[in-house]
Regions:
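Short coil/turn connectors at secondary-structure junctions
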Residues: 22-26, 71, 92-96
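C-terminal helix-cap and adjacent tail motif
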Residues: 98-126
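Solvent-exposed alpha-helices and their adjacent loops that cap or buttress functional pockets
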Residues: 20-22, 90-92, 112-114
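Short, small-residue-biased leader/transition segments that mark boundaries at the very start
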Residues: 3-5
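Small-aliphatic-rich amphipathic alpha-helix that forms the alpha element of a beta-alpha
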Residues: 28, 43-87
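Short secondary-structure boundary segments
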Residues: 32, 78, 104
């Protein structure tokens, strides 16, 4: 599940070394819910942890939607989980996995240096 925080005090708490994120007007907290029995059994049979796959898909869509609206985003995984859970009322039995910050970028994006396609894509064989 996701939780949106727009209180700058709560948003900045527990961010530790991510000081830049305190200026973001919106923080979307990604919270892991317990699996239902079908997902649990499927995960055991397939040896895959489906909640993390689902969280990855949801996070990608959130950041892509922000980008399509001209907003910037940053996915944070390094924060004080206990502190943020205490301030936001997230139950102790839930896991806070990510903080996705959303806002208007302070400056234009720099051109990124990317590896060539042949270095990251393979066909028919790894």
């Amino acid at each position: 599940s996701e939780m949106c925080i727009r209180d700058s005090g709560k948003a900045a708490a527990g961010l530790g070394m991510n000081k830049f994120a305190k200026d973001a007007p919106v923080h979307i907290l990604v919270v892991e819910e317990s699996m239902n029995i079908t997902s649990f059994l499927g995960a055991k049979i397939k040896d895959k942890y489906f909640p993390l796959i689902d969280i990855g898909i949801a996070t990608a869509h959130i950041t892509l939607a922000a980008e399509s609206e001209g907003l910037g985003s940053c996915i944070l995984g390094w924060f004080d989980e206990k502190e943020i859970k205490k301030l936001t009322g997230i139950p102790a039995n839930k896991r806070l996995l990510l903080d996705i910050t959303i806002g208007y970028p302070a400056k234009d994006k720099r051109k990124k240096s990317r590896k060539s396609k042949d270095k990251v894509v393979s066909y028919n064989h790894y």
